[in-house]
Swiss-Prot record:
Similarity annotation: Belongs to the sigma-70 factor family. ECF subfamily.
UniProt-annotated stretches for the region Sigma-70 factor domain-4: 130-182
Biological role: Sigma factors are initiation factors that promote the attachment of RNA polymerase to specific initiation sites and are then released. Extracytoplasmic function (ECF) sigma factors are held in an inactive form by a cognate anti-sigma factor (NrsF in this case) until they are released. Regulates expression of only a few genes (Dsui_0154 to Dsui_0159) in response to (hypo)chlorite, conferring resistance to reactive chlorine species (RCS) during oxic growth.
Disruption phenotype: Growth inhibited by 100 uM chlorite during aerobic log-phase growth, no expression of the SigF regulon (Dsui_0156 to Dsui_0159). Growth of a double sigF-yedY2 mutant is completely inhibited by 20 mM chlorite.
Keywords annotated in UniProt: Cytoplasm, DNA-binding, Sigma factor, Stress response, Transcription, Transcription regulation
Region (Sigma-70 factor domain-2) residue spans: 34-102
Cellular compartment(s): Cytoplasm
GO-annotated cellular components: cytoplasm
Name of the protein in question: ECF RNA polymerase sigma factor SigF
Main location class: cytoplasm
């Protein structure tokens, strides 16, 4: 019995909204304003059920759906139930919201997810620095200093010569022979 009352109540609301909407389409501004007010309550309830975990999005989505109903009012077929047409529009707006959120979340991963990437990159860089320092420590100064100044510190050959007190050609030869010695040492370690 209670179910019958609910169905009758729903049908009565459906007919009332439909009547207001059709009168509004005919130019009755007061009926259209009343329709939009009552429809917003209907949409709010409809969307609140579907956005339990996103309650902050309900009002924005109600406004988007109302705007879509207004913009698409010319597509409504009066021989069809108004609620089905409105719910279809609201569902499309709901899907749009979920797509926007998915794209946003995909583009904006939380920092916690990326912290492992940064920490492993830092750890790998520290290991590489340590290994390189061990390799360079075994080289004589006339090989080690030119490599450190030009390859690690980014100095030009002239700047490296000024800093180390060596000639520019000695810097070039030192870098070449030092890298060759490092390559041989690494090959021997493998």
């Amino acid at each position: 019995m209670q179910r019958i009352n609910r169905e009758e109540s729903f049908r009565a609301k459906e007919e009332r909204l439909k009547d207001l909407f059709v009168r509004g389409l005919s130019g009755n501004n007061a009926a259209y304003q009343t329709f939009l007010g009552e429809l917003s309550s209907y949409l709010r309830a409809f969307l609140r059920k579907r956005l339990i975990r996103l309650p902050d999005e309900v009002e924005d989505l109600v406004q988007e759906a109302l705007l879509a109903v207004h913009n698409q009012r010319h597509t409504y077929d009066p021989s069809q139930p108004l609620s089905a047409w409105v719910q279809a529009i609201a569902r499309y707006k709901l899907v749009d919201l979920f797509r926007r959120r998915a794209i946003y979340e995909q583009r904006n991963d939380t920092l916690d997810d990326g912290m492992d990437l940064f920490s492993s990159a830092d750890a790998e860089a520290a290991e590489a620095r340590r290994d390189l320092n061990k390799l360079l420590a075994d080289l004589p100064d006339h090989f080690r200093l030119p490599i450190m100044h030009t390859k690690l510190e980014g100095l030009s050959v002239r700047e490296a010569a000024d800093v180390s007190g060596m000639s520019e050609s000695a810097i070039k030869v030192g870098v070449h022979r030092g890298l060759k010695a490092l390559a041989a040492k690494i090959r021997g370690a493998l």
